[in-house]
C-alpha cells in the first residue's frame, strides 16, 4: 500500500435511532443508523410475517382465476 493516500481509520461511536450506542471502526467521525441489532426484528425475535396466501387469493379474485 502506498503511504499517505489512505484515509485515517479510527474508532467511532455508532448511534442508532433506538438510542443504542456501540463502538466500531470507520474513516468517518460519527455514524448514525436507523436500525441495529438491539431493535432489528431478526435479532429481537419480534418478526412480522406477511401472509402470502392472502395476497395470492386477492390476486386470483381480482382476475377471476380458479
UniProtKB/Swiss-Prot annotation:
Name the coenzymes or cofactors required.
Zn(2+)
GO MF annotations for this entry? metal ion binding; rRNA binding; structural constituent of ribosome
Entry annotated with the keyword Membrane: no
> Which note does the record give on the cofactor?
Binds 1 zinc ion per subunit.
InterPro entries, A to Z: Ribosomal_bL28/bL31-like_sf (IPR034704), Ribosomal_bL31 (IPR002150), Ribosomal_bL31_A (IPR027491), Ribosomal_bL31_sf (IPR042105)
Keyword terms of this UniProt record: Metal-binding, Ribonucleoprotein, Ribosomal protein, RNA-binding, rRNA-binding, Zinc
Q: Where does Zn(2+) bind?
A: 16, 18, 36, 39
Cellular component GO terms held in the UniProt record:
ribonucleoprotein complex; ribosome
Q: Which Gene Ontology BP annotations are present? A: translation
According to the lineage, what is the superkingdom? Bacteria
Coiled-coil spans are none
Per the similarity annotation, which family is this?
Belongs to the bacterial ribosomal protein bL31 family. Type A subfamily.
What the protein does comes down to: Binds the 23S rRNA.
Subunit (UniProt): Part of the 50S ribosomal subunit.
The protein, known as: Large ribosomal subunit protein bL31
This protein's species is Geobacillus thermodenitrificans (strain NG80-2)
Amino acid at each position: 500500500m502506498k503511504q499517505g493516500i489512505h484515509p485515517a481509520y479510527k474508532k467511532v461511536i455508532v448511534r442508532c435511532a433506538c438510542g443504542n450506542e456501540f463502538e466500531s471502526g470507520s474513516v468517518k467521525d460519527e455514524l448514525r443508523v436507523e436500525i441495529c441489532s438491539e431493535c432489528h426484528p431478526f435479532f429481537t425475535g419480534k418478526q412480522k410475517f406477511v401472509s402470502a396466501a392472502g395476497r395470492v387469493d386477492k390476486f386470483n379474485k381480482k382476475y377471476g382465476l380458479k
